[in-house]
């Protein structure tokens, strides 16, 4: 165990060293650019309002640049995972002594998936995760505190954060709000409910800067209809998009029954015979082999599909927990059941509120699933394979994000593999050492081609990517991001691109590619067809 912990510590140190080394290299001109340029919508109710109202002024005041924000984001993600682990530990320690340091590291490191497969900034996905992690942690801390003043204070903090969540993802807020209300009604004093309702109201009006709660709800409802039902992925509604993608995720999980059987067997072996130790080690190696064979160990965009091992692990652990509960070997208290339900639902409810399918959103919130798995493992009788399951999932976490966390500043191929020569893609690369006229001409051409019905070309500015807005000298009006640019955002934009051009001679270019990585996982037919293979990313990369 000490050897394992030592290796994980070295991995953690190397993570920060390597990330700091390239944190000032390149920028993703899609999601990351949106947050770096502090874009704000003039329309109320959109899910970006929290970032603009709360974090924009802080970034402006401190004049944080891309490197500082990236490192701050990495630290924030890991601290939120650590907080959840710290909150879960005392709750578990009251009933057993099975807590292992590997569990703390496991929960702490899983936010790397969220950080690794999106823009490196604290995006609204990150805000959703951080807020939900803090909310659940505060509620768990409150449930173990006997001091009423501390308990009320923790409930009030969770309520404030829930109100802020209202301005990040409205559907997530609704379901989370209902789950917390039910938890308080059945597991806390009734006075906690009053504290929670008051704190939530204060959180909502703080973010929206509006005391008219009914107007706020109307704005969110209107923006949800406009923003969500845009026909992305071939779906006409959130419900159609979510249910069909969820069906695919579960279908992928249940087609790998051998892994479920292996996990259940590994967790059931209790004896310390040498033969049993050999069997458990063999099963652990089999899990790693199957994960490699099933293409779980991916990088970049393919890392979206790293959720399958967590599905399989959660299914296995929950099944065994029910078995032990039925045999009266373990007993679940009422408040434990509610917290387990919240942790189980959190990856799903945090995924709601965007026009992205659950099959892509679920993996970024696996920290909650990791906490669920750890709690159930600690409740069940200790076995030879108890700590190996989190270790297995932790290895997958590092492997699927190795490329993006340790080597790349943005979501593209490793920088040492990218050249100025066009790659085998529909678009190739747009080199910044070309003439300005040639760059503008190429970008406009790709925009026109991608705007045609049925196009599968990599997009540069389908929704108004800020980087494109600068390159084409603001010659076009863009439907979303472009029209949100103000003096502050354009000055940050121009300063960044100017600095990057000065620091490199001929190695700066826009790398554009069509991502067909989803094809290997298949597609399916339903009332609507979700075209997973049309994921397109335009990236601005600096090769050193």
Predicted segments with their positions:
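Extracytoplasmic catalytic/substrate-binding loops of multi-pass membrane glycan-assembly enzymes
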Residues: 20-36, 43-58, 63-67, 235
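Aromatic- and kink-enriched transmembrane "portal" helix at the membrane-lumen/periplasm boundary
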Residues: 66, 70, 95-97, 107-129, ...
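Transmembrane-helix motifs of polytopic, lipid-linked glycan transferases
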Residues: 71-97
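Specific aromatic-rich, kink-prone transmembrane helix
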Residues: 127-147, 154-162, 369-372
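Membrane-interface alpha helices of multi-pass inner-membrane proteins
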Residues: 152-170, 176-182, 199-204, 343-354
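Short periplasmic/luminal acceptor-recognition loop of GT-C membrane glycosyltransferases, typified by
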Residues: 170, 399-486, 506-514
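Membrane-lumen/periplasm interface segments of specific transmembrane helices
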Residues: 192-271, 289-295
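Aromatic/acidic, Gly/Pro-rich catalytic loop(s) in extracytoplasmic/lumenal soluble domains
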Residues: 504-544
